[in-house]
Amino acid sequence: MVLASFLVSGLVLGLLAQKMRPVQSKGVDLGLCDETRFECKCGDPGYVFNIPVKQCTYFYRWRPYCKPCDDLEAKDICPKYKRCQECKAGLDSCVTCPPNKYGTWCSGECQCKNGGICDQRTGACACRDRYEGVHCEILKGCPLLPSDSQVQEVRNPPDNPQTIDYSCSPGFKLKGMARISCLPNGQWSNFPPKCIRECAMVSSPEHGKVNALSGDMIEGATLRFSCDSPYYLIGQETLTCQGNGQWNGQIPQCKNLVFCPDLDPVNHAEHKVKIGVEQKYGQFPQGTEVTYTCSGNYFLMGFDTLKCNPDGSWSGSQPSCVKVADREVDCDSKAVDFLDDVGEPVRIHCPAGCSLTAGTVWGTAIYHELSSVCRAAIHAGKLPNSGGAVHVVNNGPYSDFLGSDLNGIKSEELKSLARSFRFDYVRSSTAGKSGCPDGWFEVDENCVYVTSKQRAWERAQGVCTNMAARLAVLDKDVIPNSLTETLRGKGLTTTWIGLHRLDAEKPFIWELMDRSNVVLNDNLTFWASGEPGNETNCVYMDIQDQLQSVWKTKSCFQPSSFACMMDLSDRNKAKCDDPGSLENGHATLHGQSIDGFYAGSSIRYSCEVLHYLSGTETVTCTTNGTWSAPKPRCIKVITCQNPPVPSYGSVEIKPPSRTNSISRVGSPFLRLPRLPLPLARAAKPPPKPRSSQPSTVDLASKVKLPEGHYRVGSRAIYTCESRYYELLGSQGRRCDSNGNWSGRPASCIPVCGRSDSPRSPFIWNGNSTEIGQWPWQAGISRWLADHNMWFLQCGGSLLNEKWIVTAAHCVTYSATAEIIDPNQFKMYLGKYYRDDSRDDDYVQVREALEIHVNPNYDPGNLNFDIALIQLKTPVTLTTRVQPICLPTDITTREHLKEGTLAVVTGWGLNENNTYSETIQQAVLPVVAASTCEEGYKEADLPLTVTENMFCAGYKKGRYDACSGDSGGPLVFADDSRTERRWVLEGIVSWGSPSGCGKANQYGGFTKVNVFLSWIRQFI
C-alpha cells in the first residue's frame, strides 16, 4: 500500500514535472506542505499577531518546494487589519473597530451627532434623549437662547422649556416680549428681549431750550436743543440716549460768538480744522483749532496748532513748511551738497566767522554751485559774519558768474555753464515769554523742537544743526520727566538722543555731539565717528512705557523720529560784535553759540602761507560784551620764488648773509673821520632800548617758508653742466625787497664751432682727418629694404642737442619733394668710420622724430635745398659731439668772398671712386657765381646759381665734395674771437653730372645765411 502510494505519488510527480517543464511550476495543493504564518499588525500603532497561511507544492528544475498558495504574500493580507482595533487569527474580519468607525474591516465613517452611539457592524446611530433623526441631528423641542446679563428669565419646564418669561432688574426697562413660546416647528415665537438702562433727563441750557422727541428716556430717545437770539449753540443740536444709559455727547451751551479771520493756505502743508460749533455759524468761530502737518520732506516752522481766541484773534502766526538740509554746514561746505529741485528753497544754518576762513566764491547774487555756501551768503548780504539761517535756492543752469568785492569777501568771475544758486531770507520767528522760537517747547532751560519725521541719526543731527540747535543732549544719564511728557504730548514713542554708546558690553559712556563746545568729564565725552564700536549703534529714548522712559540703542542708520534742543542760557549772556574777516588769514572759533559770539567764546587767528600775525593770537568775548584785544593783522612776508633753472645748467640757492653791512671786495683801507678820539666816540648814536615785542624782521624771519620760496637777500648761483656750454645772463642773482631776483635770467647755450683737435685743417693736397676733429659732423643712414641694411648716404651738421641741418634732397624721394618716413633714418654723431662695426662707445646714434623740408624746395634745380631733422632724444655734448655755429650777416659777407678758403667734410666718394672709410676733408676756395656759371657753360652744362646758392672749388678740379657728401657742412674759420670758432656757411648740395673734381665744374652749396629765419622757427 505504501509502495503503491509511493508509485502513484511518483507517477503524479513525474506527470506534473513533465507538464510544468521547462523551468518553474505552478503551486499545487498536494497536502505535502505545512501551514506558514504571516506576522501582521492590528491597528495603528496597534500590536502584532500571526495569521495561518496554507502552502502549496511548487517545482523548480524537477525539484519540489513549498510556499504560500497563489504566491500569496504578507502585503496581500496584512494591510486590512491596520484599520481594526482588535483582531483574531483565522477570523476574516475585525473583532472591534476604533471609535467613529464601522463595517467588516472598519472602513465606514460613523455620522452620529450629539452623542449618538454608532453600531460597529451597520453604522446605525442610537440617539440620546432629546435628539432624533438618522444621525441624531434633530433636537426635540426648541433650542435654548442666550440673554443679556440684566435679563431675568423663568423656564417652564426647566429641562425642556415650552415657554420662557422675562423681567428686568431694578433701574432697567424691558424692551421686547415678556413671554416667548416654543412652536411646533422647533422655533421660538420671538427673540429674547433686552433690559435697557434709562438716560437721565437733561435740563435746558442757559439762554436756550431742550425738547424730548419721545416719552421714555431709553436707547434711541432724542433731545433737541435750541438757543434764544442772539446766542449760538455750541455743541450738538441733538443728543441720543445710548444703550449704556449715557447721552451720545456733551450737553451744548448757548454763547454769544466771535469769529477769527480766514487763514491763507500754507504751501506743502495739510491742515485739520476742529470747530467748537457748527460750521453754519462761520468758518472759524472762537474755539476753533487748526492743526498743520507738513508733507514729505518738509519741516514745520512755527506753531503746529492755531486756536481762535475769544477776542477773534488767532493764538499765533501761521507756520510755514520748509525743507531743511540734513547735513551739518560749516564754512567750507559747498552749495552743491544742499541744492534741491530748481526753485526749491532749502534751509541751512551757517556758523559764525565764515568771513574769517578760506573758501572760493564764484559770482554775484547768483553763484556757482561749487562756491562756499556760507561765504556766498555773507557776500550776498543775506547773513552777517556772526552766522544764521538762510534759504539756498537752486537757480538752474547759469554761465555768467561775475566777480565782485562785497561785505568783506571777494568773489571770482567764471564764464562756464554750471548749476547755480541764490538766497532767500529766512522769516524770523518770534519768541514767547520763555525765549523759545514759535513751535518750540521750554524744557529745563532748553528749547525743544519735536518732529515725527524719520531720519537716520546723522541726518537727524544735520536737521537740528540747520535749525540752530542740536539733537537733544542731556548732561546726566537720567531722563527728565518734563522731556518725556513733551515727547509723549507730540505722539512720539521713540526719539534719537545726541548720546552714543561706545560698547554694548560695557556701561554707557555718554557723548556730547555739539562739536563747537566740547565739555569733557566723567559722564560726557565727545563722539568721533572713527572710533571703534561707534559705527553702528546710536542711542534713542524709548518712552512707550507710561511709567518710565529708558535708554536703548539701535543701528545709527535706522530711521527714527527725533528732538532738537537749544540752550536758553546763551540768550542771557553778553554778546560781542562781529569782529569781521581777517585779510589773508583764518580764524578758529571756540565756544561760540550757533547764532553769534557770546561771553566766553574766543577766536584764535592764524595767517595764510607767507604771512605772519601781528597782534594777539587769541581774543575772547568778555562779560561786558567787548573783545579782550583788537583783531590782529596778517602781514605778508616778502620772498622770491624758485628762480628758473636753465636747461643743461643748475642753480644753487645760498641763504642771506647774517650781516646787513655792505663790504666792498678789494678795498685797501677803511676811511676814518679826522676827529679827536673822544669826539669820534661821541659821534656814535646812543644804543636803542630793547623792546619786549619782537620786531617785524624777527616775526618775518620765524615764518616757515613753503618749498620754492626764499627770503630777501638769498643768492642764486648759476653754473652750466659741462664745459661744452657757456652761461649767458647773470651768474649770480639776489632776492631783492620787492620779491624779484636781480640781474638777468641765466641760460646755458652750447658752445658752437669749437674743435678740440690741435691739427690745422688747412693742409694743402691733404684729405685726412682726426677722430673728433669735426664734432658737428653728422652721418645720416637710410634703411635699404631691398638690401636689408643701413647705408650711410648723407652728411649733416649738428645745430644743438636736438636738431640737425642737411640737404633737402637727402630726406626726400628722388626728383620729388615728398619726405621719406622718418623711421627710415638713423643719425650718427661722433662717428669717424663709415663701417658701423668699428664705432666705439663715444658714437651716439639717434632716431628721427620729425623731418622739415623747406616749403620752397625745388627738386628740379635743387633751389632751397635745405632740411631740418629733429631727434627723438637729445644728444649729449662731448669732445666728439658739439654743435656748429650758424652764420651772421657779418660772417657771411666776410666768408663768401671769392678765394676765401673753407673746409668740406664727409664720407663721400674719393678719387678711387670708392666711399671713404673715414671722414675726409677738403679745403676749397669760394668761387664767384659768374665764374661758376661760365665754367659749366663751357662744359656745355648751363645752369644758374641762385641767390640761395654759392660755389666753391678749384679751376683744375683737384678736390671737391662728391657723392655721399651731400648735406654735409662747408665751414669757415672765424678768428675774430680769442678762440677760433667754425661757422657753417654752406651745405653740400650739387655737383657736376660728369663726376667729382672736374676742371671748371665747381661744387654747389646751399647758402645757410638765407635760411636763418626759417631755421629759428624750429630750433
From Swiss-Prot:
One of its GO terms (molecular function) is carbohydrate binding. Residues 140-197, 198-256, 258-323, 574-636, 689-750 form the Sushi domain. It is found in: Secreted. Gene3D superfamilies: Complement Module, domain 1, LCCL-like domain, Mannose-Binding Protein A, subunit A, Tie2 ligand-binding domain superfamily, Trypsin-like serine proteases. It is an enzyme of class 3 (hydrolase). Coiled coil: none annotated. InterPro entries: C-type_lectin-like, C-type_lectin-like/link_sf, CTDL_fold, EGF-like_dom, LCCL, LCCL_sf, LE_dom, Peptidase_S1_PA. GO terms for cellular component: extracellular region. Residues 102-137 form the EGF-like domain. Keywords: Cell adhesion, Disulfide bond, EGF-like domain, Glycoprotein, Hemolymph clotting, Hydrolase, Lectin, Protease, Repeat, Secreted, Serine protease, Signal, Sushi. It comes from the Eukaryota. SUPFAM superfamilies: C-type lectin-like (SSF56436), Complement control module/SCR domain (SSF57535), LCCL domain (SSF69848), Trypsin-like serine proteases (SSF50494). Glycans are attached at N523, N534, N624, N740, N767, N912. It catalyses: Selective cleavage of 103-Arg-|-Ser-104 and 124-Ile-|-Ile-125 bonds in Limulus clotting factor B to form activated factor B. Cleavage of -Pro-Arg-|-Xaa- bonds in synthetic substrates. Disulfide bonds join C106-C118, C112-C125, C127-C136, C142-C182, C168-C195, C199-C241, C227-C254, C260-C308, C294-C321, C331-C350, C354-C374, C436-C447, C464-C564, C538-C556, C576-C621, C607-C634, C720-C748, C794-C810, C932-C951, C962-C996. This enzyme is closely associated with an endotoxin-sensitive hemolymph coagulation system which may play important roles in both hemostasis and host defense mechanisms. Its active form catalyzes the activation of factor B. Heterodimer of a light chain and a heavy chain linked by a disulfide bond. This is Limulus clotting factor C.
